Amino acid sequence: MVNSLDSGLLEAANLPWHSRASDDVLSALSATREGLTTDEARKRLAQYGANVLDKKGGASVMALIWGQINNPLIWVLIGSAVIAMLVDPADGIKNGLVILAVVIINTIIGFAQEYKASKAIESLSAMVPEFATVQRNGKRVQLPVAELVPGDVVFLQSGDKVPADLRLFHLRTLQIEEAALTGESVPVEKMTDPVAENATLGDRRNMAFSGSLVTYGTGLGVVTTTGNGTELGRINTMLGETTAVATPLSIALHKIGIVLTVGIAVISVAILFVGTARAMSEGGVDLLTGLRESVIFAITLAVGAIPEGLPAIVTIALAIGVQRMAARRAVVRKLPSVETLGSTTVICSDKTGTLTRNEMTVQALYLPGSGAYRVEGTGYEPVGRLSKDGGHVTAVPDDVQELLLAGVLCCDATLECKDGRWQITGDPTEGALVTAGEKFGIHTANARVRHARLDTIPFESANQFMATLHEGDAEGMKIIIKGAPEVVLKRCGNVDPDMALRQVEAFAAEGMRVLGFAEKRFDRAGLTLEDCARGFEFTGLQAMIDPPRAEVIDAIRACHQAGITVKMITGDHMGTAQAIGEQLGIATHGAKAVTGVQLAEMDAAALREIVKDHNVFARVAPEHKLGLVRALQDNGHVTAMTGDGVNDAPALKQSNIGVAMGITGTSVSKEAADIVLTDDNFTSITAAVEEGRRVYDNLIKSLAFVLPTNLGLALILIYAVAFFPLVEKTIDGQMVKDLLLPMLPTQLLWINLVAAVTRALPLAFEAKEPDVMNRPPRDPKEPVLNRFVVFRTFLAATLMTAGAVGLFLWRYELEMAARASSGLTEAQIVSEAQTMAVTTVIMFQVFYMLSCRSLNDSVFRIGLFSNKTVFIGIGAVLALQALFIYAPPMQAIFSTFPLTAQSLVFSALAGAIILPVISVEKLIRNRSRA
């Protein structure tokens, strides 16, 4: 923006440029219509700074890595690894390195997920052109845009990008496309007269805004603001100040991490004291030795209780959701947003192109002699029928043909089919006129040859009409005028203007834009404004609108059925927004659209109230969109925001989930968003919501599967330190009795990371629950560790503990009794019992995974073989477990011992107990809920 300004220019910089006469603006900026001198421009450049947007760098690589490590559970693991290596140099080095390897793997996964962070500000800079045509020293020259300063006079022509914010003072039929900034669906016809001080951005028709595109005509304007002082710069500033909102899943996982960290710390300290006390009282060791051995036990518990595999499981589940969403035309840029969609309570949608087709379409006609007609068909495809009073018209009347021909001749747009899709070249409004004519047999090219244009008076905002002179038939030449209905009607003598204007009001109430047409015979080759002043015959009205997508109505109905409110936030006019909102079922009964002018007068408390009862917002500016999203979030909503323009980027970033358009969306909006729709269709959002809910259900299944293992391992270790027999062990040359470990830290890591991930993965492929879109969104305040997950965790963990502890003690005592004949050492016997305990936990997980495939139904009801991935996972884990038990390298790493067939059968039977128990639990829960 401005680095430093003298007091006079500073005062001028705060003026509402659009509300003042252009000469006053030039005077306030100490500028003239001939532009600045080179010396004056150089001085101002030193004061104002370059006309560039501030760049704010994203997070560095090291910051991203630190973000993955700075997690309570990760610090527990790192601390455990360090302590293990210090306390027990023999086995502790191996255990510590394995634990650190797990930390590194988790860090790599998280870093890869977040590395492609949004770079929206760089894309904003790309919207500004590199060079501009500027008047310096009274001459037009090409200058780098960065050198523009307030007071420079800029020349604009069709195809130019506006290089800074300009107050226009001279123009000829200038039209500028501002959709990316304002949401206006058609190019804006510019003028030079002042407008109201409180006019919204889209109504400041005497301004040209940086980054917008000139589509027609020429103009001159004086630079009022540059760099971050422009409207584009304000968005840049808002985008830099807007922080990404944490997703419900990330919040929930963080809370789980805190709960687990505190719980693990408390239990580990308790084990440290109990273990040390037992070692000293029953084992006869000193305090230091007892403490050292108890520390190993506490570390083992910490490693066992931490769900190291959970981040990988969550990432895999979300990644599968990404693939499914991509197949449904929603490309996910940020993984956690997959789950967030499932808990969305409000969707704030732009209108143009998302809820509507972004293709202006003539939908109604009015003829002075025969009344109103309806035109069927939407978009630019020239297919549709004519109807009147509810019945189809088989033969198109002559007066209708004359009106449609006038629309085709008095415009410059063309229509053609490219790659199977009908497209226009030119103004969208004129494209609608050409399409309407083509629908009923008026071929544009032939008509324009048969009625060749001889002269044109282009549209001027001061005149509010366009006129064309054409070769006629035997009766001579004719003039056609097209423009604002009231302006056209004043020039006609064959019509009741009040009746026609009532029809204009009726069409406008439906949100349609109305153009009037008139003709008169003429006998001269040239065309002047005086020739167009009177004597016309009123041909009729053509009313058009950017129509709603037909499929969106069903999609919005599905959202309502799923408990999701849909709000339309658009830069378009109030009447159009209200009409579209009512057609789509968005507008609440009796509630009118709220305008940006009204929003600007509200404080935060008023905004929080207005968003409760109103669903349609029109003529909104970027800060209004941002304020509405924040108000909804303050009211406790999980908000999804759709958009395609630069003006949407701050709100996209602020919302819980930003959804950008892939076809019409700017790069700024795409990079600020979490999800990009490849078809720009609202129905894809509904499909993505359904997929998000399925992902969340499957994450709950994964949590219900993983957490019992961690709690069970903790219970096993707690039971062991309190009740297991002590074993003889040589420490520093002295025979003492030491605590008996049912599992080693490395074995616990095997269960948690390798085996658990292998079995939890199939749960991510489970089909959606039957009621997925017939229930309200999940309360964002509801913890992931809800009553169901907690109860299921304790139930399953208790069963797992009983099986693993029972079989460990059975195998240990059985082998100890037969050690004389077996020849096994006590260390080998302990290793065999530990291997059997691990295998029992693995078999428990195999059968428990089958139970977790559905939240409410038995595995036999949903179909045992309905998810083939389950059995791929089972096969993989059994193969890995066989290597764990019998492969010499694995035996060396994990200190395992080969098991007999009898031991394997017993482990499988103990694990299978969970299947009938959980089936009964589901049955009881379903009956109590009914």
Question: For each predicted feature, which ranges?
Answer:
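A C-terminal functional module that forms or caps the active site or interfaces directly
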Residues: 852
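Alpha-helical transmembrane segments of multi-pass integral membrane proteins
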Residues: 90, 792-807, 843
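Generic alpha-helical transmembrane segments
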Residues: 755, 834-849
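Helix-coil boundary and interhelical linker segments in multi-pass alpha-helical membrane proteins
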Residues: 722-743, 810-833
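Transmembrane alpha-helix/helix-exit interface in multi-pass inner-membrane proteins
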Residues: 271, 764, 801-813
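Conserved cytosolic headpiece of P-type ATPases
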Residues: 1-777, 784-785, 798, 838, ...
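Membrane-water interface at loop-to-transmembrane-helix junctions
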Residues: 780-798, 826-836
